[in-house]
């Protein structure tokens, strides 16, 4: 059957299948080991089995945890195996959502709608998001199915549906929720400026979601995530939130395991490097295919502000600029595929008036699209060379995007060694000993360490963590780390640390 003769319903199923298969590939290649940094945290939450720990959690983004924990309880599958199934399902749902937007909002043909779904599935930024940001992917997936409902002429039936979807979004992820609010607000502003009918029903629809989101701002987001009862925190990071506002960051003062910049140039270099890595081959196509749409353009604008505001106001910009930049893949993919379609149809020069200065011949358009797809393919399948290095990215991009999907917070080849280390600790620790836990192994500790033993979390300073252990009255302290430099993290082992257990490249050191 030719694609142009395919019905939209069958195209929708095919779009889901494409995303599912693409995301299943890295999971199969890494089997039975987990991939993704936060994946270990999700496994720990499934293993814990608790969805809401406090009444205020109803205002949090709890929905994905509720789904995963319910599935875990029903299936009794190993958490890592369950996540290897859920990750492709979420990605397939996302590519189906991309198809849904192309179909219902932009009225694109089935072939073009399938093209944007497949193109998105193989984008480096999309795969990097799906590597471990399950909440992010889940929230964005629901947002995609919501976007076609954002219409000036929405009826009351659509208003009820939009209200329900809005609640799912705000319980899904914060950036997805802010994106929804920005799109509705943008439509309102344009309606006022153009003296058009004001979309009151859109505002009515999102009122419940706004209430939940405000509850998140007041009761959840300003406070650190609750830790396990057996955890102590050293608090040796500097989060640098101006005026105590959790959603802003002073990027020239921040010092965390994820973000630390020696100068404005270092910050600029990091932002520019990540943008080039993710979108250098996508932007020319997006320029050719740029089109105007009220809600969609405001979404793209919001994500651009989140990505680059740190360069304009480095002392007070939206936090997690790297996450905002990864999210840019959603609108940019639509613009890029529209550009590729124009080039394919011989209309490369029929671009938006705003970008009339840019020209793209067919060969360049095809080459750019193929290169971006190849990068995505390498990213999801290439193994670590010597258990250390992938092929994607360079020095200051690794904090935001790994060099390959074939890893978690530790290289795949070190997964068994990590589990062995915690099994050894569970049989050799006593009530008078503690475990010093670097951020790298925090989620592994949540998952594997017996809760009768105390863990002291730190981000940068092992010596200060050791002092805290002494102050707390512990007679001995252990530390899990590599017994050789793998070039991933800045923390270096002191030569006087004594290894008491080795499993491959992972060792348990006795610090005191």
Residue map of PLM features:
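Structural alpha-beta junctions
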Residues: 449-455, 493-504
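Alpha-helical scaffolding within the catalytic cores
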Residues: 461-469
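Extended non-globular interaction regions in eukaryotic gene-expression and organellar proteins
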Residues: 488-490
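Short, basic, helix/turn surface patches
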Residues: 466, 485-486
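Structural motif
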Residues: 427, 469-472, 492
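Short periplasmic/luminal acceptor-recognition loop of GT-C membrane glycosyltransferases, typified by
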Residues: 375-462, 476-484, 509
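Membrane-embedded transmembrane-helix bundle of lipid-linked glycan/lipid transferases
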Residues: 1-398, 433, 437-438, 445, ...
